[in-house]
Amino acid sequence: MGMVRHTNESNLAGFILLGFSDYPQLQKVLFVLILILYLLTILGNTTIILVSRLEPKLHMPMYFFLSHLSFLYRCFTSSVIPQLLVNLWEPMKTIAYGGCLVHLYNSHALGSTECVLPAVMSCDRYVAVCRPLHYTVLMHIHLCMALASMAWLSGIATTLVQSTLTLQLPFCGHRQVDHFICEVPVLIKLACVGTTFNEAELFVASILFLIVPVSFILVSSGYIAHAVLRIKSATRRQKAFGTCFSHLTVVTIFYGTIIFMYLQPAKSRSRDQGKFVSLFYTVVTRMLNPLIYTLRIKEVKGALKKVLAKALGVNIL
């Protein structure tokens, strides 16, 4: 009965997100910087979504998946960053239990879906480069929608399992979360009972949603690189390399930071190091996506200029 009472008290009182409380002078600087990056992220990813929809030349599987990725980035930042900004600005760092619950489900579902979608995009790139004559037959709209749906549903499914298991743990009045967002690993640490099963389940999920997609991307990238080197046309070869390089850059930054967070032993890094890496993963990686794609892929740059020219009624060279 005592454990139940303490657990209920934690649920009613909510949690205290310590965030960057140890760096009071840095919090205001981070607030301004993160606010700017947040606005750039929303603007950049919304631009990619609109351009992909408005420009007929971009009505292709690659840009269909890219618009889904941008939509994911937009939703993730909108579910995480506002709470982070409040945490940095307000002296009171509390978050209601219900708010933490919504925060946990949204961020975990969107983040898990993001882990699957780049692997789907690599599949599209593999068919486009290695099987160009069969591309339109294989990558039809129904398959693209099915692959995108698979990514979304897998993210939602793993979230229902992991988040539910985590929130069933008794916290025994422990309210201080040494992070700036509600995440499964940090909430598991608050539990006052054994968490071996939760940690094992989280590790297995991390393998499935991180190592498996990364392995698939690396293998497909190897086949793509081999096929690109055999292209005789320098223009086509440069175009293929540019597209694949952009995708690999985004993938490397995204998976590199998240693997560091979820698969590195907790004892091998300091708690502050984990916070700053998490901050980079949460804010910076999603801002870089539109920047990298628009700078590296000529079709996106050309379509963006065309859409802006129509909107502004001017001729943009």
Swiss-Prot record:
It comes from the Eukaryota. The chain crosses the membrane at residues 29-52, 61-82, 104-123, 143-161, 199-222, 240-262, 276-295. Coiled coil: none annotated. Residues 53-60, 124-142, 223-239, 296-317 are cytoplasmic. InterPro entries: GPCR_Rhodpsn (IPR000276), GPCR_Rhodpsn_7TM (IPR017452), Olfact_rcpt (IPR000725). Its main location: membrane. GO terms for biological process: detection of chemical stimulus involved in sensory perception of smell. It is found in: Cell membrane. Keywords: Cell membrane, Disulfide bond, G-protein coupled receptor, Glycoprotein, Membrane, Olfaction, Receptor, Sensory transduction, Transducer, Transmembrane, Transmembrane helix. Disulfide bonds join 100-192. PROSITE patterns: G_PROTEIN_RECEP_F1_2. It is a multi-pass membrane protein. Glycans are attached at residue 8. Residues 1-28, 83-103, 162-198, 263-275 are extracellular. Odorant receptor. Belongs to the G-protein coupled receptor 1 family. This is Olfactory receptor 2G2. It comes from Homo sapiens. The gene is OR2G2.
